[in-house]
């Protein structure tokens, strides 16, 4: 059996929160709002959302950014939430005593949340490099990355 080895990524960091006492369904509602957004935008969204699940997720996103800046020296302005997943954890079961010697079960669900942040500065530099060679009118003699473009000349937008 051949196993795929994970490549070491130098541009991504993660934070894992286990046994967070919250339903996985309720945590997913919050996670779906921040997936794919930038780090700063996600923090603003999490601060303003009125759900109880926002605070633990806010702490995880903040922790992942601290891991990025401390462990790998990445800038927080270039970070994007590339992967955010919520898995169901253990269910804590208790008994609540009721009248006449009876008891009702109480189920307290937990979840595991993983936040992966990725640095986009490397990709932005690569995209600028590719766009430099794809645009018409660009040549290798030009040292700066400005090329002739139909939008910059005003030819396309001047006519109505």
From Swiss-Prot:
Coiled-coil ranges per UniProt: none
Keywords: Chloroplast, Plastid, Ribonucleoprotein, Ribosomal protein, RNA-binding, rRNA-binding
A GO molecular-function descriptor: rRNA binding
Bilayer-spanning residue ranges: none
A GO cellular component annotation in the UniProt record: chloroplast
Domain of life where this protein originates: Eukaryota
Classification via InterPro entries: Ribosomal_uL22, Ribosomal_uL22_bac/chlpt-type, Ribosomal_uL22_bac/org-type, Ribosomal_uL22_CS, Ribosomal_uL22_sf
One BP term from GO: translation
PROSITE patterns referenced in this protein's UniProt entry, alphabetically: RIBOSOMAL_L22
Localization in the cell: Plastid, Chloroplast
PANTHER family (UniProt xref): CHLOROPLAST 50S RIBOSOMAL PROTEIN L22-RELATED (PTHR13501), LARGE RIBOSOMAL SUBUNIT PROTEIN UL22M (PTHR13501:SF10)
Record-stated family: Belongs to the universal ribosomal protein uL22 family.
Function: This protein binds specifically to 23S rRNA. The globular domain of the protein is located near the polypeptide exit tunnel on the outside of the subunit, while an extended beta-hairpin is found that lines the wall of the exit tunnel in the center of the 70S ribosome.
Subunit-level organization: Part of the 50S ribosomal subunit.
Official protein name in the record: Large ribosomal subunit protein uL22c
Organism taxonomic ancestry: Eukaryota, Viridiplantae, Streptophyta, Embryophyta, Tracheophyta
């Amino acid at each position: 059996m051949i196993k795929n080895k994970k490549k070491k990524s130098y541009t991504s960091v993660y934070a894992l929160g286990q046994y967070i006492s919250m339903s996985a369904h309720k945590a997913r509602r919050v996670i779906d709002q921040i997936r794919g957004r930038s780090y700063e935008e996600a923090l603003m969204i999490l601060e303003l959302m009125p759900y109880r699940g926002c605070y633990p997720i806010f702490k995880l996103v903040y922790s992942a950014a601290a891991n990025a800046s401390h462990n790998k020296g990445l800038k927080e302005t270039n970070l994007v939430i590339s992967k955010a997943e919520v898995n169901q954890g253990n269910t804590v079961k208790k008994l609540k005593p009721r009248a006449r010697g009876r008891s009702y079960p109480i189920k307290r669900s937990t979840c595991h949340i993983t936040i992966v942040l990725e640095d986009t500065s490397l990709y932005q530099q690569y995209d600028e490099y590719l766009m430099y060679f794809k645009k018409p009118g660009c040549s290798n003699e030009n040292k700066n990355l400005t090329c002739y473009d139909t939008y910059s000349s005003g030819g396309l937008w001047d006519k109505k």
